[in-house]
């Protein structure tokens, strides 16, 4: 069983509430079959809670109630499955092109009984028109200048992109601002999530999209 510190447990209890047991089971999947199948590196096991699950789950505070969220490049379900567990009000579509990852994701979803998750085996650019998302999330997919083109079109002209980034967030925004504006991004900002819960809060880039000619 993956160890969890007192501080991590306190944060997890606040984020996941009565669904904490589901989060613990998800972490065990990451530590066992997730590692065996190459979705998570073995060295990450001791920090699955802090660096991965909690780091992702805290972005739920940036997502409105009852949103349909498309998670691009879901991989091991970070942040998609974290959000599905923390927020049963959300409808999640996990977009992942690699078959072995899709198979693993489906096994975990089935085991946890997550009825608010759909998994699509495809590339983000091919999913345009197939997903009607209010919010698009991503973590460790690519630089923002490229990521904008993979995420914004999934919003059908309006909504938000919430991308987990690191210390280079502001620099990435500067480099991507022309692309973002061209795609319909009207406001881009850096948001810090989990300041009161985590020792190292999560930095996200938030893009509000409202493309001319499109209505909510």
UniProtKB/Swiss-Prot annotation:
<comment type="function">
    <text>Specifically methylates the N7 position of guanine in position 518 of 16S rRNA.</text>
</comment>
<feature type="binding site">
    <location>
        <position position="73"/>
    </location>
    <ligand>
        <name>S-adenosyl-L-methionine</name>
    </ligand>
</feature>
<keyword id="KW-0963">Cytoplasm</keyword>
<keyword id="KW-0698">rRNA processing</keyword>
<dbReference type="Pfam" id="PF02527">
    <property type="entry name" value="GidB"/>
</dbReference>
<keyword id="KW-0949">S-adenosyl-L-methionine</keyword>
<keyword id="KW-0808">Transferase</keyword>
<protein>
    <recommendedName>
        <fullName>Ribosomal RNA small subunit methyltransferase G</fullName>
        <ecNumber>2.1.1.-</ecNumber>
    </recommendedName>
</protein>
<dbReference type="InterPro" id="IPR029063">
    <property type="entry name" value="SAM-dependent_MTases_sf"/>
</dbReference>
<feature type="binding site">
    <location>
        <position position="139"/>
    </location>
    <ligand>
        <name>S-adenosyl-L-methionine</name>
    </ligand>
</feature>
<dbReference type="GO" id="GO:0005829">
    <property type="term" value="C:cytosol"/>
</dbReference>
<keyword id="KW-0489">Methyltransferase</keyword>
<feature type="binding site">
    <location>
        <begin position="124"/>
        <end position="125"/>
    </location>
    <ligand>
        <name>S-adenosyl-L-methionine</name>
    </ligand>
</feature>
<comment type="similarity">
    <text>Belongs to the methyltransferase superfamily. RNA methyltransferase RsmG family.</text>
</comment>
<dbReference type="InterPro" id="IPR003682">
    <property type="entry name" value="rRNA_ssu_MeTfrase_G"/>
</dbReference>
<dbReference type="GO" id="GO:0070043">
    <property type="term" value="F:rRNA (guanine-N7-)-methyltransferase activity"/>
</dbReference>
<feature type="binding site">
    <location>
        <position position="78"/>
    </location>
    <ligand>
        <name>S-adenosyl-L-methionine</name>
    </ligand>
</feature>
């Amino acid at each position: 069983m993956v160890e969890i510190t007192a501080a991590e447990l306190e944060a997890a209890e606040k984020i996941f509430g009565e669904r904490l047991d589901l989060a613990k089971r998800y972490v065990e999947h990451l530590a066992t079959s997730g590692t065996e199948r190459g979705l998570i590196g073995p060295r990450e096991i001791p920090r699955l809670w802090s660096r991965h699950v909690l780091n992702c789950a805290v972005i739920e505070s940036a997502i409105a109630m009852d949103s349909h969220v498309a998670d691009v490049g879901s991989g091991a379900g970070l942040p998609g499955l974290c959000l599905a567990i923390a927020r049963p009000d959300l409808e999640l579509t996990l977009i992942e092109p690699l078959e072995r990852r899709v198979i693993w994701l489906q096994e975990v979803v089935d085991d946890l009984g997550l009825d608010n998750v759909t998994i699509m085996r495809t590339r983000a650019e091919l999913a345009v028109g197939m997903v009607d998302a209010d919010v698009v999330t991503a973590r460790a997919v690519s630089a923002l200048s490229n990521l904008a083109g993979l995420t914004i079109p999934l919003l059908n002209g309006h909504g938000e992109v919430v991308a987990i980034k690191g210390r280079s967030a502001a620099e990435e925004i500067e480099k991507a601002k022309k692309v973002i504006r061209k795609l319909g991004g009207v406001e881009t900002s850096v948001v810090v999530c989990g300041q009161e819960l985590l020792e190292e809060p999560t930095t996200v880039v938030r893009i509000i999209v409202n493309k001319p000619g499109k209505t909510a």
